[in-house]
């Protein structure tokens, strides 16, 4: 009985269902067609059977060449994006490595200061000036702001990029202003006195400020102590107490430094003459406005220099 059961189990079924027969025929037909196509393609016959579902241009050599060129271009763009990403990551690692050189306490203090700048919103100018007066602004603060700016650029956060870029420039300007020479500090003050409208009134105020800052260039004024009015012959004649540092700014020193600054700026202008903003896209318009602002500042510095050269007390 067991042997009979084994024979019946291993034998093929006597009756197959219509569904099984149909599937078997379809599979056999597809295999035969695929085999025929493969054989024809390998034999190199001109009457090659087109693959079902493929567009006619698939067999066009020119179309294939164009597709290969597109593929090469896409791969090139992909490589450039990967290289740019690697460059940004390398910059971030470099900044992170540089931050490790500073003590942990200084890092926490600088990060706290930068966070206070970001939270200050409209009062950020006062907060930066207050920090500068306390001597809290240094290279470490700039590096932390740049670190955050780099992260925002990687994440393409446009609002954060704009805010952090302005914050970086403002802090950098304040640091440079504190480290500047007396002549550059005076020049910065004179430029900030301009309200943007009245040039004549601004030049008049500049002349008055220069006359008060520069010592008079005559023998009697040089011999007299500070505070003595040479015109009215009034004031103390006691010699001034000598100090370790003399912050007196001479007109000749101011003229020399401002003229050197102008020469340097003009050289940079000549080097960037060909990169003028053209077109109506946002970047070109921003570049054009920046160049106009720079030219206006140069003209103001030239006016200040001419005023200092011809200053009369």
From Swiss-Prot:
Molecular function GO labels: RNA binding; rRNA binding
Organelle targeting sequence: 1-22
Tissue-wise expression: Expressed in green tissues, including leaves. Accumulates in chloroplasts of mature stomatal guard cells.
Gene that this sequence comes from: PAC
PANTHER family assigned to the protein according to its UniProt record, in alphabetical order: PROTEIN PALE CRESS, CHLOROPLASTIC (PTHR37219:SF1)
Domain of life: Eukaryota
Organism: Arabidopsis thaliana (Mouse-ear cress)
Disulfide bonds: none
Protein name per Swiss-Prot or TrEMBL: Protein PALE CRESS, chloroplastic
Induction and repression of expression: By light.
Subcellular location: Plastid, Chloroplast; Plastid, Chromoplast; Plastid, Etioplast; Plastid, Amyloplast
């Amino acid at each position: 009985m067991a042997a009979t059961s084994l024979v019946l189990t291993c034998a093929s079924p006597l009756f197959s269902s219509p569904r099984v027969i149909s599937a078997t025929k379809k599979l056999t037909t597809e295999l035969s067609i695929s085999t025929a196509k493969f054989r024809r393609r390998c034999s190199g016959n001109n009457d090659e059977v087109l693959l079902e579902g493929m567009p006619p241009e698939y067999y066009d050599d020119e179309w294939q060449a164009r597709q290969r060129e597109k593929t090469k271009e896409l791969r090139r763009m992909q490589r450039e994006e990967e290289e740019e990403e690697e460059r940004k990551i390398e910059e971030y690692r470099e900044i992170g490595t540089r931050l490790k050189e500073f003590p942990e306490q200084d890092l926490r203090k600088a990060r706290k200061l930068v966070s206070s700048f970001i939270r200050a919103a409209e009062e950020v100018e006062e907060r930066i000036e207050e920090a500068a007066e306390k001597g809290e602004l240094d290279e470490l603060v700039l590096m932390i702001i740049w670190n955050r700016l780099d992260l925002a650029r990687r994440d393409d956060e446009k609002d954060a990029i704009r805010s952090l870029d302005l914050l970086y420039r403002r802090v950098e300007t304040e640091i440079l202003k504190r480290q500047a020479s007396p002549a550059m500090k005076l020049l910065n003050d004179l430029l900030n006195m301009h309200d943007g409208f009245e040039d004549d009134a601004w030049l008049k105020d500049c002349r008055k400020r220069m006359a008060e800052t520069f010592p008079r260039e005559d023998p009697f004024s040089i011999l007299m102590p500070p505070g003595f009015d040479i015109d009215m012959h009034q004031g103390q004649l006691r010699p001034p107490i000598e100090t370790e540092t003399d912050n007196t700014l001479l007109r000749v020193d101011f003229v020399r430094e401002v003229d050197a600054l102008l020469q340097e700026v003009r050289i940079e202008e000549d080097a960037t003459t060909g990169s003028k903003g053209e077109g109506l896209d946002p970047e070109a318009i921003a570049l054009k406005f920046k160049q106009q602002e720079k030219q206006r500042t140069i003209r103001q510095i030239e006016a200040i220099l001419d005023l200092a050269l011809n200053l009369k007390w």
